[in-house]
Amino acid sequence: MNLSVAPKEIAGHGLLDGKVVVVTAAAGTGIGSATARRALAEGADVVISDHHERRLGETAAELSALGLGRVEHVVCDVTSTAQVDALIDSTTARMGRLDVLVNNAGLGGQTPVADMTDDEWDRVLDVSLTSVFRATRAALRYFRDAPHGGVIVNNASVLGWRAQHSQSHYAAAKAGVMALTRCSAIEAAEYGVRINAVSPSIARHKFLDKTASAELLDRLAAGEAFGRAAEPWEVAATIAFLASDYSSYLTGEVISVSCQHP
């Protein structure tokens, strides 16, 4: 694994100076680790979490080696309420505060409804939707008593809006993330908290490469105006904007990160 980055990717503008940012599902080379890297480049300290302990440690070490800010890591299974609560508690204990939560965890699959088991449906909904609820709840319980407000950014998907064969469980979960984003944003406003979501179309990462065929990936990429998938850092840049004070009048919004043909 190599987290080295191009200059245009790492160049920061201080958007998150002094902030503490938590990113879930941040092990490896996908959107989570790219978001942590972008947050560091923008002046934040970060806490990354994942249930893959070894990969999480490796990612934390490589992020730390960039020399951009403090990096902590917490092993966390987002399907466990106790572990999610502990993630937020550990962050505030170690870092002294929490400013931004990025809910990045998700799980997909390729199964038609007629062939899908209850367990498969439940697992995808738990990881991709209920985990967002768990972490949002834990963060809001902290933010409502904090004097500085906060930000939550959720990772949804264009499949929350669009139909795709064999993706009913994942699409339903991501549509739920969009609805949770909008509804919780109304509630959180009284705490000075903003909640938004990004909705990527197709972004390259190892999990996608393993679960989707080369033919499917090529077909999906061909549907983009640029004829390619997004790089994780391109999604992370939008997340950083939503986490920053430059989006201070945005809440309850779902921002599409795609270049779809009209």
From Swiss-Prot:
It comes from the Bacteria. Pathway: Steroid metabolism; cholesterol degradation. Keywords: Cholesterol metabolism, Lipid metabolism, NAD, Oxidoreductase, Steroid metabolism, Sterol metabolism. Its EC number is 1.1.1.-. NCBIfam families: PRK07831.1. Involved in the final steps of cholesterol and steroid degradation. Probably catalyzes the oxidation of the 5-OH group of (5R,7aS)-5-hydroxy-7a-methyl-1-oxo-2,3,5,6,7,7a-hexahydro-1H-indene-carboxyl-CoA, leading to the formation of HIEC-CoA. PANTHER family: 3-OXOACYL-[ACYL-CARRIER-PROTEIN] REDUCTASE, CHLOROPLASTIC, SHORT-CHAIN DEHYDROGENASES/REDUCTASES FAMILY MEMBER. This is (5R,7aS)-5-hydroxy-7a-methyl-1-oxo-2,3,5,6,7,7a-hexahydro-1H-indene-carboxyl-CoA reductase. The gene is ipdF.
